Swiss-Prot record:
Reported induction: Expression is positively regulated by the azaterrilone A cluster-specific transcription factor tazR.
Recorded family membership: Belongs to the cytochrome P450 family.
Annotated source species: Aspergillus terreus (strain NIH 2624 / FGSC A1156)
Protein name: Cytochrome P450 monooxygenase tazI
UniProt keyword list: Heme, Iron, Metal-binding, Monooxygenase, Oxidoreductase
Pathway(s) of this molecule: Secondary metabolite biosynthesis
Domain of life per record: Eukaryota
Gene from which the chain derives: tazI
Amino acid sequence: MAYIQASSTQAVVVLLLVLVLTKIYRVYTGPLAHLPGPAISKWTGLVLQKHLFAGNRPRYVQKLHQLYGPIVRISPDELDVSDSAAAKSIHRVASRFYKGRFYEHIGHRSPKTLFSSTDPQFHAYRRRLLGGAMSETSIRQHEPTVAQKVKLCVDQMAREAERRGCIDVFKWWCFLATDTIGELSFGESFRMLEKGEKSQYSRDLELVSTLMIIRTTFPFLSRVAEYVPLPYFKQAAQSGKRMFGYASESIQRYKKHVEMKGXXXXXXXXXXXXXXXXXEGSLTEAEIRLEAGGYIVAGSDTSAISLTYLVWAVCKNPLIRDSLVAEVATLPEDFTDDDVRALPYTRRVIDETLRLYPAVPGALPRAVPPEGATLVDHFIPGGVTVSTQVYSLHRDPKIFPDPDRRFDPDRWIDPTTEMRDSFMPFGGGSRTCIGMHLARMELRLATAHFFRRFTSPTVSTKEGFTDDDMYQHMYFLVSPKGHRCLIDV
């Protein structure tokens, strides 16, 4: 018996030794061994996951680029590239760098959506079905809805300033963006602007969005939660059911509206396209609900974050603020989005905000095609995950001088080709954000109305507000650390 036990122990030791030696061999001789990066990245991705969970991944990866150059190994099987030519190659239309495994964990077992699908044929087909509703031409038809909500938002800000002595622009921009995309997606506003508080749908959305971070960082927890009732997952499941129910009610309401008044009377862009697709048998009702819900996720916090950092950055610099105020003051009383679009300085302020404070600053992971690819003079084998993050692309000092410390709209007076190639606040290629045109319209109209109404705003110090409140927590989306942005007007 003792002999058997000793032999078993020796076998285990030998097996462990073989595994360790195999790992060491692969680390130092594998196809990624020659790539620059910290030594720890060759062995484990835990350091990267730690920074991801702490909301710090883009800053961590940017520091690695500053140390190791434009291509860096950030985990055993993942690289990050900060090079405009490589990014253009990866994200161009018809690129064979398809979305990576990261996206497969977003919906877990839910049907795939336009955003979460990794299949290019599925994505192309679904985008053809849904893209028309969010095209620039279609969004123009909804300008009155967007403009009305922007005006209501600024009116509510003015009332808060009288009552509170300052404005929390982050709160109001969140209400604006969510109410707007809610009406365009479901045909009915959440009425957060009128009530001055978050709706149940918005609170549910926050919980489900946080769960998405956990799923993509620790996908095994989703599988565990199927058998073990983890409290947070249980709460998120209840929130998901409420959101699903709201979407179902909205779609049924839309269908009844069509039956009574015809499709031409319906105002909901996403619901109109999705219901038309359902009538053709292209999408199930469950798929329509998921796509409409995806519009809410993509179209709420993103625009609000951009507007918040735009106002904060402008108010910190009196020269920029005064130039912007002077330009929007030239608009006619009943100005339109086209009028704002024609303002060069306003456009530069918006672009500089999207450069320095993109709402989605982190990785856009893609899988290298099976035959491999050469990126930044390095051959990368097929199947490796390669990411590009706009946080780094937008901070390349060779392309954007003094990129971190200087909020400079004038850098966009005559942008270089490299600046245009590196500028990707809405993604790139066939995967460019479907809501880009709506986001741009919201940014233009909200910026113009805010700085026409408030002509000398400054960053507040009331209620203990400091720049530390605006420190960015970077998950998939950015959020200010203090979840507020106080402005004196």
